[in-house]
UniProtKB/Swiss-Prot annotation:
Lineage: superkingdom: Bacteria
Entry-linked HAMAP family: NDH1_NuoD
Name under which the protein is recorded: NAD(P)H-quinone oxidoreductase subunit H
Function description: NDH-1 shuttles electrons from an unknown electron donor, via FMN and iron-sulfur (Fe-S) centers, to quinones in the respiratory and/or the photosynthetic chain. The immediate electron acceptor for the enzyme in this species is believed to be plastoquinone. Couples the redox reaction to proton translocation, and thus conserves the redox energy in a proton gradient. Cyanobacterial NDH-1 also plays a role in inorganic carbon-concentration.
Entry EC no(s): 7.1.1.-
Record's keyword annotation contains Translocase: yes
Entry membrane topology: Peripheral membrane protein
Single GO biological process annotation from the record: photosynthesis, light reaction
Alphabetical list of PANTHER family matching this protein: NADH DEHYDROGENASE [UBIQUINONE] IRON-SULFUR PROTEIN 2, MITOCHONDRIAL, NADH-UBIQUINONE OXIDOREDUCTASE 49 KDA SUBUNIT
Pfam families reported in the protein's UniProt record: Complex1_49kDa
Amino acid sequence: MTRLETRTEPMVLNMGPHHPSMHGVLRLIMTLDGEDVVDCEPVIGYLHRGMEKIAENRTNVMYVPYVSRWDYAAGMFNEAVTVNAPEKLAGVAVPKRASYIRVIMLELNRIANHLLWFGPFLADVGAQTPFFYQFREREMIYDLWEAATGYRMVNNNYFRVGGVAADLPYGWVDKCLEFCDYLLPKVDEYERLVTDNPIFRRRVEGIGTITREEAINWGLSGPMLRASGVQWDLRKVDHYECYDDFDWDVQWETAGDCFARYVVRMREMRESVKIIRQAIKGLPGGPYENLEAKRLAAGKKSEWDAFDYQFIGKKVSPTFKIPKGEIYARVESGKGELGIYLVGDDNVFPARWKIRAADFNNLQIVPHLLRGMKVADIVVILGSVDVIMGSVDR
């Protein structure tokens, strides 16, 4: 009896740039052999807006409102690194109160970033409910930002060279503490819903595994790196702002799969709440209303008017010149290492403004992870990376 031999030709498939699970305008050219992924080629650049070139034609004061559009899920980190680079190069001192306020805003942004990752990732896996839950919590962060900065999600335009744009308003500290008390039980609720769910575990455990050596060699950072067994967090390594004043731990896992990346991010939300509570408790001068009362009671030229109790050190003029020299400044964003390589030329405009986006580097490993996997695992692996195309394409 003769057997018929069937041969299948590899199929080339386009995913994106309008696919709902692409997390922006990312296009993947997939080569498939049946259900198996043979090759993957990411096509980026659909959201390129020339952010580095724009920076070379704007003063630092003018450029801060632009930067929220890089990683539009976490705009505060972009603002932080945008002012940190000129501060380091020009030797601008930042008051301790301003530094504490910055840390509070950055950690709120880290929580918001991880919440916005959590919802769509679970939707990619097949769980729709948490997608709506996380917006409830994120809305409260928006309200806090709106009270402090005047804007909700992006374009807060809050960070300044030498400090922040305005002090925290009346009652803001109490509202922030209320949010911290509210969030922790909700994170526990997420964990009860998701972490031990057998369907979720089978979708993510052992999928998209990255070894410690691979994570380092590919230049990964953030939860992608820490989930592969590398204890590397720039808040501990670089000692920037005032993170050394607080008691908190670097969260990490060793498995390196999608589940490990999920666990790291969930734990980081708890650590962020821990940092926010300590920053509010140790805020120099206390809440704004208390600080105002102390200043009025002590009269002019009191200790409460000292440098460390200001929200900004010295307001820089619109003609603030970036000194001649070069520097690399970086912060630990929700996605990893966000860096700026700045070249100054004793001019109001920078000579070069190079952006090192965390998710641009993290996206590089996706084709390597997808080869040999099933089609159903594509969106799970991509979702676990946490990619925002505004930051990748810039």
